[in-house]
Amino acid sequence: MRGGGKGLRARVAGCVCLCLLAGAARGVEAASPNGTASAIADVNANAADEPLSADARYAAQWIVDADDHRGLPFAIVDKKAARLFVFGPRGRLVGAAPALVGSASGDHATPGTGQLEPARIPLAERTTPAGRFASEPGRNLGGEAVVWVDYDAGLAIHRVRPDAAEAQREQRLASATPDDNRASLGCIVVMPAFYDGVVTPWLGAGRGVVYVLPESRPVAEMFGAVAPRVSMLLP
């Protein structure tokens, strides 16, 4: 659910509430010389320490090579791998974790879904939409710190909330397969430790960019056809 804060506009069509649930250790972005070649080297070097999925690796290299993030910290959500990768402004991987994503498969959101009470969102519409989004920190109606991906659509990154379902969610994250990580209303919800240690310092201090990779079409198609045009409209 959304709350007070500045309105945001997604850079691609379709959005719904994103919540990240994950746990992982934080990395530190090392200083490196300016320039695209150096940034791409950082992406390649870090893959050995925190293996990127093939799709996330392709996306990260494309983003840095095209400077699509315009020097802002950015995150990549790989729904198929159920994993979140956070990068610093130079393209250095600073943290990664398993993630819960929308329980329904699909890359698009139904208009108005973000305005519904959680219990009223149809099962088929509980998707995590793919695309490129400008992010900004804020607070929801309960005063909880979140990272808004699209405020008007209620799309945000936030901590897992303490309730009866928390233990089950942690079990899903701890499992060896990403198949049981399709468990949110469409949100991306992270474990408090990961949110506080990685999301807050890198995406919670100012503007950023969140890339949600598609699951119904090739990732190369998303970046080859959409990103070059979208990058002209960076926040």
PLM regions with names:
Residues R2, S32-P33, R126-P235:
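Exported/periplasmic cell-wall-interacting domains
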Residues G35-A54:
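N-terminal, Lys/Arg-enriched amphipathic/low-complexity engagement segments
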Residues R2-C15:
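Bacterial N-terminal signal peptides that target proteins for export
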Residues A13-G23:
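Bacterial N-terminal signal peptides
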Residues A25-A37:
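Signal peptide processing junction and immediate N-terminal pro/mature segment
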Residues L8, A24, L203-G206:
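Residue-level recognition of short, well-ordered coil/turn positions
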Residues D55-Q168:
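Gly/Pro-biased beta-strand-loop elements
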